[in-house]
Regions:
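Structural recognition of the beta-strand scaffold that forms the well-ordered cores
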Residues: 60-63, 93-97, 190
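Alpha-helix C-terminal capping segments
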Residues: 49-54, 81-92
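A cross-family phosphate/adenosyl-ligand binding-site feature
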Residues: 2-49, 56
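Short glycine-rich anion-binding loops that position phosphate/pyrophosphate groups of nucleotides
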Residues: 41-42, 65-68, 196
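Charged helix-capping and loop-helix junction motifs
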Residues: 75-81
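Glycine-rich phosphate/pyrophosphate-binding loops
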Residues: 87-107
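Active-site/ligand-binding-proximal alpha/beta "capping" segment
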Residues: 47-67
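Electrostatically charged, flexible surface regions
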Residues: 107-212
Length: 212
């Protein structure tokens, strides 16, 4: 199976899935492997791979991100933006993330997580999956998007400068074992089916008859 890779030259998290129009920035061909690097966003890498290289891919893989992508992180993540862009172009996608300190150690679990998705035919149920790998792995769980697991604050340095920081907090719904945050912090690789659809379908069904 032919594998082709395009990657951003600089880290782009948090960027979700913006694309640069009309040009995605500088593109460089890497020596010795069939791979390209780009000064652009992860979503642009996906678009270049599809439209620039004129290929149809089995699966778009994004990551490993140096930082977990759970709960509200999903909204901001460039790593997630790559698979959402894959979904926009009718491709399957998997995003992989872990803590910054665990990137090298997490590599050994990539095959395990990937094989879990493939061996259980998960793509029959969803085209996009978000995978988060903890430092100590007990197993793998199918999860859903969790609640906030850190607090946000801004610290004023001077009259015109602020710094943003956050602190880890307990899962706001610890009794819900199906959340990605609960699984991750209890030592399980979380595998969350995702969708590119942003419509609130429950509200839509209730409101669609109110048209005038």
């Amino acid at each position: 199976m032919l594998t082709k890779t395009s990657t951003t030259i600089q880290t782009t998290s948090p960027t979700t899935n913006p694309t640069t129009v009309p040009t995605p920035g500088q593109i460089a061909v890497l020596e010795g492997v069939e791979a390209w690097s780009m000064e652009s966003t992860p979503a642009d890498c996906v678009r270049f791979g599809i439209f620039g290289l004129h290929n149809k891919y089995d699966i778009v893989l994004s990551g490993i991100n140096r930082g977990v992508n759970m709960s509200g992180d999903i909204i901001y993540s460039g790593t997630m933006g790559a698979i959402f862009e894959a979904g926009n172009q009718n491709h399957k996608g998997i995003a992989f993330s872990t803590t910054p300190e665990n990137v090298a150690a997490s590599v050994k679990y990539l095959d395990e997580a990937f094989n879990f998705i493939m061996n259980n035919n998960l793509f029959e149920y969803s085209a996009l999956y978000n995978v988060n790998i903890p430092e100590e792995v007990k197993g793998i769980k199918i999860t859903k998007q969790g609640d906030a697991y850190y607090s946000d604050a801004f610290h004023q340095v001077d009259e015109v400068t602020y710094t943003q920081y956050g602190e880890m907090i307990a899962d706001t719904c610890p009794e819900d074992k199906d959340r990605d945050t609960n699984a991750f912090y209890n030592g399980y690789i979380s595998v969350t089916p995702m969708t590119k659809e942003r419509t609130d379908l429950v509200a839509f069904e209730k409101l669609k008859n109110k048209n005038i």
